[in-house]
Amino acid sequence: MPSVRLASTAGRVVDLAEIAERPAVLFLYPRTGEPGKAAGPEWDAIPGARGCTPQSCGFRDLHREFVALGVTVFGVSTQKTGYQSEFVERNHVPFELLSDRDLALTRSLRLPTFEYPVERGGPTTLIRRMAWYVEDGRIEKIWYPVFPPDRNAQMVLEWLGARGRVLPEVRSA
């Protein structure tokens, strides 16, 4: 895992090389929606774009199971930390979201992206949805593409169980 430092919704800077030393899940997503604002038909036309909030809330809803397994959860997008913080508060997300606003991680690992038009200025680069399990400084497993997004957390827990981690009883999503 590269030593890339990303701003966190907890008000700190997180070095991905350091967090990858311990078991962690990073789920990467394009962007979460804005309250009271529809995404529009152009968003729906992008394969795999829709589902960021359900993916995030899936990890939120199963967060206790990850904690019980000793696995830390992080979400990553290219959105600004301020917007991510609003999302965390509004949706009661118990883990940190990390901002790759400057695309340091995206460029370092040549992550799959797409361009999306924004209201002001030119297009913005968004990360395609995926999830990683990291441990001992490296990415052990990648889920890409992720479908359906709301089941991503459950998929990760099932994989961890198949690897021999003691899987707590998991609620149905």
Protein language model annotation of sequence segments:
Residues 1-173:
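Chalcogenol-based redox active-site neighborhoods
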